[in-house]
Amino acid sequence: MPDLKIILEFSAGAELLFGNIKRRELALDGDQKWTIANLLKWMHANILTERPELFIQESTVRPGILVLINDTDWELLGELDYELQQNDNVLFISTLHGG
């Protein structure tokens, strides 16, 4: 199968945990079923560069990180069980700000 191409975006400080890169275009193995749960594991192993505890908590995103898939709240799409589709855009927004 062809690669699964998706776009990851990080904003409002989430990019600081990923090498200060706000947008990444990924080509994932198309022979594998990619859910958000699988994607988070891949991100943790491959691109999460700073303080993973600020992004992942017990195999999901920690409270305070909003996740939008194609501009739709992931809670409406099944959260971790959502199966990624070709050209999906996954946006992570941090609401955790220091004072």
UniProtKB/Swiss-Prot annotation:
Residues that bear 1-thioglycine: 99
Cellular compartment(s): Cytoplasm
Gene3D superfamilies, per database record: 3.10.20.30
Post-translational modification, as annotated: C-terminal thiocarboxylation occurs in 2 steps, it is first acyl-adenylated (-COAMP) via the hesA/moeB/thiF part of the MOCS3 homolog, then thiocarboxylated (-COSH) via the rhodanese domain of the MOCS3 homolog.
Cross-link (Glycyl lysine isopeptide (Gly-Lys) (interchain with K-? in acceptor proteins)): 99
Record pathway: tRNA modification; 5-methoxycarbonylmethyl-2-thiouridine-tRNA biosynthesis
Cross-referenced Pfam families: Urm1 (PF09138)
GO biological process: negative regulation of JNK cascade; protein urmylation; tRNA thio-modification; tRNA wobble uridine modification
Domain of life, source organism: Eukaryota
GO CC terms, sorted: cytosol
Family (UniProt): Belongs to the URM1 family.
Quaternary structure annotation from Swiss-Prot or TrEMBL: Interacts with cer.
Function: Acts as a sulfur carrier required for 2-thiolation of mcm(5)S(2)U at tRNA wobble positions of cytosolic tRNA(Lys), tRNA(Glu) and tRNA(Gln). Serves as sulfur donor in tRNA 2-thiolation reaction by being thiocarboxylated (-COSH) at its C-terminus by MOCS3. The sulfur is then transferred to tRNA to form 2-thiolation of mcm(5)S(2)U. Also acts as a ubiquitin-like protein (UBL) that is covalently conjugated via an isopeptide bond to lysine residues of target proteins such as Prx2/Jafrac1, Ciao1, Eip71CD and GILT1.
PANTHER family: RURM1 PROTEIN (PTHR14986)
Stored HAMAP family: Urm1
Protein name from the UniProt record: Ubiquitin-related modifier 1 homolog
Organism listed in the record: Drosophila virilis
Gene: Urm1
